[in-house]
Amino acid sequence: MNEEIKQKFCREFGTDRVLLEEPMKRHTTFRIGGPAEVFVMPENLEEVQRILEICRTEDLPYFILGNGSNLLVSDRGYRGVVIQMDRNFGEVKVEGTEIHASAGALLSTIAVAARRASLTGFEFAGGIPGTLGGAVVMNAGAYGGEMKDVLRKVMVMDQSGKVFEIPAEELQMGYRTSIIKTAGYIVLGAVLSLKEGNLEEIKMLTRKLSEQRTSKQPLEYPSAGSTFKRPEGYFAGKLIMDSGLRGYRVGGAQVSEKHCGFVINTGDATAEDVCGLMKHVTETVYAKFGVTLEPEVKFLGEF
């Protein structure tokens, strides 16, 4: 990307909301990643449309960033435009048994709003460290619940900037996938359909799931969450543990001793370390069990 295009972004959106060569390790839960050429923080829908228009005109790749969870950015960074949709797109509103939320709303924030309104059905997502947008795209789930269980409709933007709604029955949601992911749509917001519940029971379930997460997951280290998808009929973490890889390290990346389904950053891990570790894990598990592990983490940049 030439300097003139970079300055165009700065002029249009302001130097306080356009960062050049911004280290992506500042914006991912893995705390790993080289610089993004242009990092933009739009304030509203119209600005997102304008950014996409510039990207189309100048033939620039772009990436929509929420909370930076479930993401591994290359050490060489990203040669394109990162569009961060978090705090400026974080509205959460309760209407009866429905919650209307914008794409940048944290799942934990939505879970708190649901609990305060005595609405049940979203407890599973309260501890997932991500935003609504990313969770909808990949049909995020935990503890027996998935986003598809609670979605009524989703507002999206296509790559041309057109905005429209997709009802839940047309989202084609499966295990860590959706039509939004396959079509490359941008999530702007969603309506969640929950049920009236008992406040004390909701609090008890929330506390129980939180305790499970804290006791079983390596929350004290940076990570991208679950590193591999769950193979049909198996658990990735158990396959990795039974392959003798608990605590296995490559550089600063390590298979968590607390939960083998997590690769953690022990302090100075690089994307190269993580990729090397994932490759070794995948090859070892396949050699021992004949099961191919697929990454759940998304890769951004050149690897």
Question: Over which residues does each language-model region extend?
Answer:
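Conserved beta-strand segments that form the floor/walls of ligand-binding pockets within enzyme
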Residues: 31, 84, 100-102, 123, ...
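Short, basic and Ser/Thr-rich N-terminal targeting/leader segments
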Residues: 58, 65-67, 150, 221-222, ...
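Conserved active-site and cofactor/substrate-binding residues in soluble primary-metabolism enzymes
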Residues: 4, 25, 43-46, 105, ...
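Gly/Ser/Thr-rich beta-alpha loop segments that engage phosphate groups in nucleotides
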Residues: 35, 68-72, 79, 106, ...
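Structural signature of FAD isoalloxazine-binding scaffolds in flavoprotein oxidoreductases
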Residues: 33-34, 39-45, 72-90, 137-168, ...
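A generic local secondary-structure boundary/capping motif
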Residues: 70-71, 111-114, 122-126, 139-146, ...
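Phosphate/pyrophosphate- and phosphate-bearing ligand-binding catalytic cores of soluble enzymes
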Residues: 19-20, 157-284, 288-303
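Anion-binding (especially nucleotide phosphate/pyrophosphate-binding) glycine-rich loop
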Residues: 2-132
